[in-house]
A protein has these predicted regions:
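A short, internal acetyl-CoA/4′-phosphopantetheine-binding micro-motif in the GNAT/acyltransferase core
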Residues: 90-100
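Short glycine/proline-centered loop/turn elements that form peptide/ligand docking sites
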Residues: 108, 133-136, 152-159
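Conserved acetyl-CoA-binding loop-helix of GNAT-fold acetyltransferases
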Residues: 100-114
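Conserved active-site alpha-helix within GNAT-family acetyltransferase domains
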Residues: 116-117, 122-124, 130-150
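Short amphipathic alpha-helix that is part of the acyltransferase structural core
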Residues: 1-34, 38, 54
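Conserved beta-hairpin
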Residues: 39-63, 70
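Conserved acyl-donor/pantetheine-binding loop and adjacent beta-alpha core of acyl/acetyltransferases
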Residues: 58-91
Length: 161
């Protein structure tokens, strides 16, 4: 059974994680625990309950804000003219040997579900992501994310409408 867990370096073997992108691998090993301790971001991993040490994928969440004029005309229409709060998924990675098997979809679903739960306590309009390239952008668009008007590789998903 796949489980989402908060990163715990005493349990999760970050050094063995390889998504094929050195900067995302290195972040998990070198910076993730530090960022969590400093309240810069929270890091969540996807594991198999039979082997919780093996990280199948991870994502980070932090607070963000966005100017409404950057949103699509449809979303912008009923919002205030000042910056609004959002969530930012700063990093998102799936183990290279599992890519294309639905792990990314599961992990993204976990992130959206978590945002919806947090949103019950702290208002936030959307989940923001920054795609590294057009292939990654297409992945997010498939799940309903919309590009910002002025930043085509930055996207958002309005949540909880």
């Amino acid at each position: 059974v796949l489980e989402e867990q908060r990163l715990d370096s005493r349990i999760h073997n970050c050094a063995e994680f390889d998504c094929g992108k050195p900067e995302l691998n290195n972040y998990l090993v070198r910076n993730a625990t530090q960022d969590r301790r400093r309240n810069i971001s929270q890091i969540y991993v996807l594991v198999d309950s039979d082997d919780p040490a093996t990280v199948l994928g991870y994502y980070t969440l932090s607070a963000a804000q966005v100017d409404c004029d950057q949103l699509s005309e449809h979303d912008n229409r009923h919002l205030p003219r000042y910056p609004i709060l959002c969530f930012r998924m700063g990093r998102f990675a799936v183990a290279q040997n599992l890519q294309g098997r639905g792990i990314g979809k599961t992990l993204l679903g976990c992130a959206v579900d978590r945002c919806l739960r947090i949103r019950q306590e702290v208002a936030a309009f959307a989940l923001i992501v920054d795609a590294k390239d057009t292939d990654v952008k297409s992945f997010y668009e498939y799940f309903g994310f919309v590009a910002f008007a002025d930043k085509p590789l930055s996207l958002y998903l309005a949540i909880g409408r």
